[in-house]
Amino acid sequence: MKINISYPATGCQKLIEVDDERKLRPFYEKRMSHQMTAESLGDEWKGYLVRISGGNDKQGFPMKQGVLTNGRVRLLLGKGHSCYRPRRTGERKRKSVRGCIVDSNLSVLNLVILKKGEQDIPGLTDTTIPRRLGPKRAGRIRKLFNLNKEDDVRQYVVRRPLPQKEGKKQKFKTPKIQRLITPQRLQRKRHMRAVKRRRYAKQREEEATYAKLLAKRKKEEREAHAKRRSSARESSLRESKSKA
């Protein structure tokens, strides 16, 4: 079985092949996200704490969290599920996945180092791969460089150097900062608030005008109704007098 071990602190990962069944036996019957020591892999792994993050069986089917079996099952998967990427909106598909319990039928087991041990592992903990991209959001740049609200974030953006051409000046690529508070943004915010206040005042004024007009129409309707009733009463009185 192959074991793919990653160390997020350095950004490195290493694939090792383990043929000895006794070294792999402590991992059997363990679930995904289970934390355990890696001392069974050898003396150089003494003190290391790892987490089982997944794996693939010999036919390439991935392990899926939450499927409590060590075999293969067919599940109806949709958007938001692991082990499946929908090609169309609302598309669902029945896919074969392996359960979250480790057994001997896996070809690759994925581990993540949570705690470093006593010795360094060559190619995993002794080297550091720098991140290609820095933070893009203004709040995260402030958090990275411990800046205040008064400091200018634009001076602290991580610029990525582009491949230099012969006889040309070195160029850098700067990401666009998101959620950056600028005078234009504050002015736009003030403008939107003023527009909202004017809209609210206009709405109140229109409501008051409509209420006055409605009261006037209702008053006119009541007066017309009273006039019709009085004229009908007078005509009925005249008819009764003429019959008498």
Curated annotation (Swiss-Prot):
Its biological purpose: Component of the 40S small ribosomal subunit. Plays an important role in controlling cell growth and proliferation through the selective translation of particular classes of mRNA.
Keywords assigned: Phosphoprotein, Ribonucleoprotein, Ribosomal protein
Family the entry assigns: Belongs to the eukaryotic ribosomal protein eS6 family.
Biased composition (Basic and acidic residues): 231-244
Region of interest (Disordered), residue spans: 185-244
PROSITE patterns membership: RIBOSOMAL_S6E
Name of the featured protein: Small ribosomal subunit protein eS6
One GO process term, biological-process aspect: translation
Residue stretches of biased makeup (Basic residues): 186-201
GO terms of molecular function: structural constituent of ribosome
Post-translational modification: Ribosomal protein S6 is the major substrate of protein kinases in eukaryote ribosomes.
Protein's gene: RPS6
Pfam families attached to this UniProt entry: Ribosomal_S6e
Source organism, top-level taxon: Eukaryota
Matches recorded under InterPro entries: Ribosomal_eS6, Ribosomal_eS6-like, Ribosomal_eS6_CS
UniProt GO cellular component terms: ribonucleoprotein complex; ribosome
